[in-house]
């Protein structure tokens, strides 16, 4: 497809020079460009196909970047990136040293607020609106929220706060793509949207309220009339009770409705009309039939042929850690009726589809509400059930107070299955599970486990389930190492490490590598070159202190390796144990550096951080001047 209109747009100022009649053809080009780009790089597709018209309308109407747009979650921001000067960079999307798959302030002045976790947009936009007002600057702040993000408490906290500012230039756009819109009613539908957002409706409402102040019976009648007639068209009551002027719902793919509605909203917001709430209904995957039919499959695909769609690779794939968890969950649920599963809106991503199908009465999707999920699990545990919370490592951060106060303080037996621990590749720093070891091991009563492979993941999940205290099992994204997963549900001994390899190096050259979780494999590869001892530590807490001390006393050097932050991590736990015992063996800590690790291929990022086999080898040689075995082949 040729992109005659799209190629003329390098920023929204170019867009605003177009005639309104050109916006429809532009939307077709933009949608085709998104599809073509994502099919070549991988990334979020369905949500971006659904926001094409909305993105065009927002940048066409509002004076961006002076007017601030905040994209909640941010995975629907590709059309925004394309229209704001990054069209020619889309080939580097989510690649190493390329542009991010989410809004990023350092990337563009049009990315007014960095997002990736949900439900933050209204709070950020409220802060921007009040900041502009405080400084006497004339601008509007717009929060675009959808994809279930409105279910989180933070969104309602922000609306509750915003509603007290009656003249605030704040606009909330609810991108409702979770339900289908009724067939359009043509001119009437567009007229009602313009009427509700325009000056006539505002003036009429104000006049009725004035009349009410002098004639209470008339006012009561007027209020009832307004609520009943407006309620025939829009579910406005809840949002208006928060202090917002509600408009909608309108078709989010109909530019003939979107543009004039947003123009009226912008005018009202700038003229002191107070917070505005626009409800638009869009369809995930819009314009690409395969994505419309299965928006979940096309939510975040890898590279694919748009003409053929996503096809199985044909190659036997290694089982993923997520699949191992899903199978274990079903097997343990069949064996123990106390097990209940909880997910904060990540059924597919966390591997709980089969569990929901087989045990629907024991499956709880609480929506995007991590704080609630943790305390809810605590309540279930109080009644003698055994809750398993399946959650991405990065999202458990959102329920940290609840983890401490509502679960650990009461020593409740809740299992936290932490998917996406460590680096996550293309999703980058916002989704990396870099901090869980550090933020979990400092909590009293908490047990923290790090499986080295997919079979051990199953074993440690069983170990966690057998405990009478809160536990966490952290495992990485993607495929395992290829080992056979045994069907057993037997637990492993708590707090016991496993020596995988024993060094035969001479005195002065003896190195012990204490590896946690995913670092066991690269540490083992490096150890072959060095003739080093490798210990699969398994437990961060309780740490196998006896093993740590033995390794330090029988080796010249100790190395700790973890796919988590070095500061406060598992290596720090080992150093604390050595310090407490007065053992002064030199220690090298390897882990994620004290910076946010960007997006890119997972293997490339590990190499960048020195956590692949060659990086581990190089760090040990540099620090301790240990010589590799000459006959060993080079580590791949």
Curated annotation (Swiss-Prot):
Cofactor comment text: Binds 1 Mg(2+) ion per subunit.
Signal peptide: none
GO molecular function: 1-deoxy-D-xylulose-5-phosphate synthase activity; magnesium ion binding; thiamine pyrophosphate binding
Keyword Magnesium: yes
Matches recorded under SUPFAM superfamilies: Thiamin diphosphate-binding fold (THDP-binding), TK C-terminal domain-like
Pathway, per record: Metabolic intermediate biosynthesis; 1-deoxy-D-xylulose 5-phosphate biosynthesis; 1-deoxy-D-xylulose 5-phosphate from D-glyceraldehyde 3-phosphate and pyruvate: step 1/1
Keywords: Isoprene biosynthesis, Magnesium, Metal-binding, Thiamine biosynthesis, Thiamine pyrophosphate, Transferase
Function: Catalyzes the acyloin condensation reaction between C atoms 2 and 3 of pyruvate and glyceraldehyde 3-phosphate to yield 1-deoxy-D-xylulose-5-phosphate (DXP).
Family: Belongs to the transketolase family. DXPS subfamily.
Name of the protein in question: 1-deoxy-D-xylulose-5-phosphate synthase
Organism of provenance: Ralstonia pickettii (strain 12J)
């Amino acid at each position: 497809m040729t992109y005659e209109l799209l190629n003329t747009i390098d920023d929204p100022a170019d867009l605003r020079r177009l005639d309104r009649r050109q916006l429809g053809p532009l939307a077709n080009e933009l949608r085709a460009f998104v599809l073509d780009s994502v099919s070549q790089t991988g990334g979020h597709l369905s949500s971006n196909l659904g926001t094409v018209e909305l993105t065009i309308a927002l940048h066409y109407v509002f004076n961006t970047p002076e007017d601030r747009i905040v994209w909640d979650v941010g995975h629907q921001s590709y059309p925004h990136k394309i229209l704001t000067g990054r069209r020619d960079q889309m080939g580097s999307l989510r690649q190493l040293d390329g542009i991010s798959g989410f809004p990023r302030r350092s990337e563009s002045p049009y990315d007014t607020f960095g997002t990736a976790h949900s439900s933050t947009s209204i709070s950020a936009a409220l802060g921007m609106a009040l900041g502009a007002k405080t400084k006497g600057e004339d601008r509007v702040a717009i929060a675009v929220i959808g994809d279930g993000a409105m279910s989180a408490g933070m969104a309602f906290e922000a609306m509750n706060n915003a509603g007290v500012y009656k003249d605030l230039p704040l606009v909330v756009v609810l991108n409702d793509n979770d339900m289908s819109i009724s067939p359009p009613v043509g001119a009437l539908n567009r007229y009602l949207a313009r009427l509700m957002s325009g000056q006539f409706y505002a003036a009429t409402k104000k006049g009725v309220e004035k009349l009410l102040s002098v004639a209470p019976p008339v006012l009561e009648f007027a209020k009832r009339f307004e609520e009943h007639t407006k309620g025939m068209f829009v579910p406005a009551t809840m949002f208006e009770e928060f202090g917002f002027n509600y408009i909608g719902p309108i078709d989010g793919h109909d530019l003939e409705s979107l543009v004039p509605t947003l123009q009226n909203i912008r005018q009202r917001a700038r003229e002191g009309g107070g917070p505005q709430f626009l409800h638009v209904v869009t369809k995930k995957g819009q314009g690409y039939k395969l994505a419309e039919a299965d928006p979940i499959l096309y939510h975040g695909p890898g590279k694919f042929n748009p003409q053929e769609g996503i096809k199985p690779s044909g190659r036997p794939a290694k089982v993923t850690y997520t699949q191992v968890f899903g199978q274990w969950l079903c097997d343990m649920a069949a064996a123990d009726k106390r097990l209940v599963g909880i997910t904060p809106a990540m059924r597919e991503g966390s591997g709980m589809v089969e569990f929901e199908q087989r045990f629907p009465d024991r499956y709880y999707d609480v929506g995007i509400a991590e704080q609630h999920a943790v305390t809810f699990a605590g309540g279930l545990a109080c009644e003698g059930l055994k809750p398993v919370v399946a959650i991405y490592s990065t999202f458990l951060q959102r329920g940290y107070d609840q983890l401490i106060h509502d679960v650990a303080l009461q020593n409740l037996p809740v299992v936290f299955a932490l998917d996406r621990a460590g680096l996550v590749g293309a999703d980058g720093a916002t989704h990396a599970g870099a901090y869980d070891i550090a933020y979990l091991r400092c909590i009293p009563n908490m047990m923290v486990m790090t499986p080295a492979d997919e079979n051990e993941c199953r074993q440690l999940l069983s170990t966690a389930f057998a405990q009478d205290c809160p536990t966490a099992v952290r495992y990485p994204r993607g495929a395992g190492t290829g080992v056979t997963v045994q069907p057993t549900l037997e637990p492993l001994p708590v707090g016991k490490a496993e020596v995988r390899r024993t060094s035969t190096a001479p005195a002065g050259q003896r190195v012990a590598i204490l590896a946690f979780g995913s670092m066991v494999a690269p540490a083992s590869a490096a150890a072959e070159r060095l003739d080093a001892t490798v210990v699969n530590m398994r437990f961060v807490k309780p740490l196998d202190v006896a093993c740590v001390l033995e390794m330090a006393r029988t080796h010249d050097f100790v190395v700790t390796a973890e796919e988590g932050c070095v500061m406060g991590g598992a290596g720090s736990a080992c150093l604390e144990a050595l310090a407490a015992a007065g053992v002064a063996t030199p220690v090298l800590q390897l882990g994620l550096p004290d910076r946010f690790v960007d997006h890119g291929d997972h293997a490339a990022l590990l190499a960048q951080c020195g956590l692949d086999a060659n990086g581990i080898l190089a760090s040990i040689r540099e620090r301790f001047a240990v010589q590799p075995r000459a006959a060993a082949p080079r580590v791949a």
